[in-house]
């Protein structure tokens, strides 16, 4: 029987452009529950190209989600020619030793911004870009937990039943003895996505990440 690859490039997700109704929904948590389906969420232009080409090549079904706000707010160098970025592998977006900020998609730039602010206060945050949220790269997650012992997980979606909860569960089951403090979580609230100016109050901000990181670092 002939085998065919299937990559579903879904509509953009995420808030930040004040779009109406359900354009801003982050539904990666729902997609991640589908057995055998990969869910890929790039955070920068170079990865967007490499991960998309890798998704097309992959024999498993892949759902490829692109952050709407990053379309308009982020620029970056993209290598010419054909290349792929490995699926199922997280990336270290910034090295650090005091705390790990685990993010993906549109929250990675926020995590990097927060890490810059934290560095001014003497806190060296490591930023992990998951890139593929289903399946999770457990090895990379474990490596950063063992390195820093403190973790904050960030997602744009609502708090309940999301990727952040999955990451926290995996850490609690596999690496709890490496933790020096309870895991922190920064998410959107459990409510309907707003639109227009109301987005400003709903959205996750770098300041929220900074505050949560300080709470985790100061835990005694």
Q: How would you label these PLM feature ranges?
A:
Residues 1, 23-30, 170-175:
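A glycine- and small-aliphatic-rich helix-loop capping segment at beta-alpha/alpha-beta transitions
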Residues 2-8:
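Short, small-residue-biased leader/transition segments that mark boundaries at the very start
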Residues 4, 37, 62, 125, ...:
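Short, conserved active-site loop motifs that form the nucleotide-linked donor/cofactor pocket
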Residues 9-11, 39-43, 63-66, 127-128, ...:
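General beta-strand structural signal in soluble alpha/beta enzymes
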Residues 16-80, 206-220:
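Structural signature of the thiamine diphosphate
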Residues 16-18, 68-220:
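Thiamine diphosphate
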């Amino acid at each position: 029987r002939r085998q065919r690859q299937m990559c579903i490039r879904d509509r953009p997700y995420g808030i930040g452009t004040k779009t109406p109704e359900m354009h801003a929904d982050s539904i990666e948590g729902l997609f991640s529950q589908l057995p055998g389906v990969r869910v890929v969420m790039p955070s920068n232009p170079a990865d967007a190209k490499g991960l998309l080409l890798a998704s097309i090549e992959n024999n498993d079904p892949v759902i490829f989600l692109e952050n709407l706000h990053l379309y308009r707010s982020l620029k970056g160098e993209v290598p010419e020619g054909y290349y792929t970025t490995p699926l199922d592998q997280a990336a270290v977006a910034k090295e650090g030793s005091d705390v790990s900020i685990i993010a993906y998609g549109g929250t990675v730039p926020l995590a990097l911004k927060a890490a810059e602010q934290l560095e001014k206060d003497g806190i060296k945050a490591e930023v992990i870009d998951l890139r593929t949220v289903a399946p999770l790269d457990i090895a990379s997650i474990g490596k950063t937990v063992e390195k820093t012992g403190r973790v904050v997980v960030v997602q744009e979606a609502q708090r309940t039943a999301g990727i952040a909860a999955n990451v926290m569960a995996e850490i609690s089951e596999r690496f709890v003895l490496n933790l020096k403090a309870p895991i922190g979580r920064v998410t959107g609230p459990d409510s309907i996505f707003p639109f227009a100016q109301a987005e400003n109050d709903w959205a996750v901000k770098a300041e929220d990440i900074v505050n949560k990181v300080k709470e985790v670092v100061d835990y005694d």
